[in-house]
UniProtKB/Swiss-Prot annotation:
Residues 112-268 form the CP-type G domain. The gene is rsgA. The keyword Metal-binding applies. Zn(2+) binds at residues 290, 295, 297, 303. This is Small ribosomal subunit biogenesis GTPase RsgA. It comes from Xylella fastidiosa (strain Temecula1 / ATCC 700964).
Length: 341
């Protein structure tokens, strides 16, 4: 691989994981195949093409692989914001293996994967402490994020509209099986920079996820230290806002981390049963202790899951939500199989 013109230090400033050439064997093999190419990171994705960077604040418009432009090409095999690619001039010639990824089923009835962002360390689930506060939706975000190998962190905004912030945090912890990090901030002030700094260290990449009107753009502006992102108004009747972020973009932060801002997501559909394993690890572990391997956790004798509910160590509502999400995944998979025949 040709040494980057700007040097690895500049690549590190946009999230390159190593101080020099790649240490990962899969990356090494790919770079050896394209030894005359140089690495860059996708910072914007548009219908017309991609914008990449080899250094902070130096965007380059590039052409994608011809195969990516075919409608029949699998969408999840195209580059997304956060991906690392290899360039030949101003043309993408290869996509480097992803370390982590956040994906969902595309909105609508079609069983099609949609990638949100790649090569992340953390995802901030931004939720306003107003009518937008929904612990079950936050739990869905956690499932979606953790299944891709990314750490979820809940960022509660609009604290001035909440009478009891501590109670809201307690509710979230009750709905999570893991030691979920929850941070409550006023996104308009400088405090988020301090409160969120442990996840914003140099070289790390963080994404902002959440519904429209949750305060993602306001938080982005605060972390950037400037009014770069447009902030929209929120309807009082349902606390929902218009999409002020219209496309995903990777932005370098003053802290040395990279931030990926995303449009609000109305639907959160999962791609497979493996999505549930991380967030519902407690139920999955209990299931291994059931008498029957095919236990449905309904009324079977020797069901460890039902026993946990009986002794109060498992919340019945949590099991109900697990069944609901699992049913969605199985139903989507069944519809996909029917379309193949």
């Amino acid at each position: 691989m040709i040494e980057p013109v700007v040097g690895y230090r500049m690549l590190q400033a946009i999230g390159w994981p190593w101080p020099g050439p790649p240490a990962d064997s899969a990356w090494q093999a790919m770079c050896a195949m394209y030894s005359q190419c140089r690495p860059a990171r996708v910072i914007e994705q548009h219908r017309s093409g991609y914008v990449v960077a080899e250094a902070p604040e130096v965007p380059i418009k590039v052409e994608s692989l011809p195969a990516w432009q075919r409608r029949s090409f699998p969408p999840h095999e195209r580059a997304v914001v956060g991906d690392w690619v290899l360039l030949d001039g101003r043309r993408i010639v290869a996509l480097l293996p992803r370390r982590t990824v956040i994906k969902r089923l595309a909105a609508g009835e079609h069983y099609r994967q949609q990638l949100i962002a790649a090569n992340l360390d953390t995802a901030f689930i931004v939720c306003g402490l107003d009518g937008d506060f929904n612990p079950r939706r936050i739990e869905r975000y956690c499932v979606l994020i953790a299944s891709g190998g990314v750490e979820p962190v809940v960022v509660l905004t609009k604290v001035d509209l909440c009478v009891d912030v501590a109670a809201a945090v307690a509710v979230l912890r009750e709905h999570s099986s893991q030691a979920l990090a929850v941070v409550a901030v006023d996104a308009r002030k400088a405090e988020p920079v301090v409160a969120l700094y442990p996840w914003l260290l140099p070289g790390r990449t963080v994404a902002l996820l959440g519904s429209s009107g949750a305060g993602k753009s306001t938080l982005t502006n605060t972390l950037l230290g400037e009014q770069r992102m447009k902030v929209g108004e929120v309807r009082q009747r349902d606390s929902r806002g218009r999409h002020t972020t219209t496309h995903r973009a990777l932005l370098p932060l003053p802290s040395g981390a990279c931030l990926i801002d995303t449009p609000g997501m109305r639907e959160l559909k999962f791609t497979g049963e493996e999505d549930l394993v991380e967030e519902f690890a407690d139920i999955e572990l209990l299931a291994t202790q059931c008498r029957f391997r095919d236990c449905a956790h309904q009324a079977e004798p020797g069901c460890a899951v039902r026993a946990a509910i009986g002794c109060g160590t498992l919340d019945p509502q949590r099991l109900h939500h697990y069944f609901k999400l699992r049913g969605e995944i199985v139903g989507a998979a069944d519809r996909s199989m029917l379309r193949r025949y």
